[in-house]
C-alpha cells in the first residue's frame, strides 16, 4: 500500500515538474535541447530510487504478528524449568510436615502401656488397633525351630561384626490364662555368627534326646488345634519345668519388601535374607496367618547376653527423615533461583555500543 502511494506521488510530482520545465524551456529558448533531456532523465531516476527506498523501509518497519507471538512463547518457556523446580521444592516442604506428623503419631503409640495378648485380648480381633502399639506376649520359646535372618551387621566402637536376627516361635502355655492363645513368631534380636553355630549344635543334640525320650514313654495328652500345623508337639505341662516361660514385649510388624539386589529366600536350605512371614510360618509348621512380633527394648545395652533386642527408637526412623526433606527443598529452590536468573539474563536487552 505504501509503495503504491509513493509511486502515485512521484508520478504527479514528475508531471508538475515537466509542466513547469516545459514552460521554462519555452520562456528561455537559449538553452539547447540536449541539456534539458539529460536533466529530465536524472530527475526521473532519483524519484524512482526514492520511492523504492520508501517502500522497503515501510515493509521492514512492520514485522509479521506471527513472529511476535512466537517470541512471547519462547520467552515463557525459558522460565518453565524455574517454575517446575520451585514446585518440587514446595512439595518437599509439604512432605516434611507430613513426616513430622507421622513420626509424632508413632512415638505417641509406642509410649502407651503394652497390651497383654491373652484370653481377654485375642489377636484376631485387635490387629488393626495394634498399629505401633507394644504388646506383651507370655509363652515358651521353641528353640529347635529358630530361623536365622541375615547376614546382618552391627557396629560397636567402630568395629563391624556380622551376624543374624534370630526368629523363634513362641508357644502358648497350657492352662495359663495370661498366656497367649495361639503361637507367634518373635524376632528376638541380633546374634553373632558363632552363636548361631553353637545354638544349632545344641538344638540338634536336644532334638535327638527328645526323640529318644518320646520313643520310651509315648504321651496320651489331648492335641490342640495347632498340633495339625506343627512339626513338633506343643509345649505341655511336663515341659514347663524344664523350659522357663518368658514374657516378650514387642511390636507387631509385617513383612519386608526386598529390593532387586536382595537374593530370594531358600527355605529348603534355611537361608533367609528378608522377612516373609507366611513363608517363615510354613517353614516352622505354623499357619500362614501367624503374627510376627519384634522384641524391642528402651536403651538397649549392647553388652547384654545374646540375643540383643532391637532399640525401640529404630521403629520411629524412616529412610527419608524430615531433615532430608529440608535438604531436598533447599536444593530445588537453589536450582529454581539459578535457572530463573539465567532466563532473566538471556532476555535482558543488551546496551547498544556507539
Swiss-Prot record:
Transmembrane regions listed in the UniProt entry: 76-92, 328-344
Main localization category: mitochondrion
Localization in the cell: Mitochondrion inner membrane
Pfam families, per database record: SURF1
Keywords assigned: Membrane, Mitochondrion, Mitochondrion inner membrane, Transmembrane, Transmembrane helix
Membrane topology (UniProt): Multi-pass membrane protein
CDD domains (UniProt xref): SURF1
Record InterPro entries: Surf1/Shy1, Surf1/Surf4
Biological processes annotated in GO: embryo development ending in seed dormancy
One GO cellular component term: mitochondrion
Annotated PANTHER family: SURFEIT LOCUS PROTEIN (PTHR23427), SURFEIT LOCUS PROTEIN 1 (PTHR23427:SF2)
Purpose: Probably involved in the biogenesis of the COX complex.
UniProt record similarity statement: Belongs to the SURF1 (TC 3.D.4.8) family.
Name assigned to this protein: Surfeit locus protein 1
Organism annotation: Arabidopsis thaliana (Mouse-ear cress)
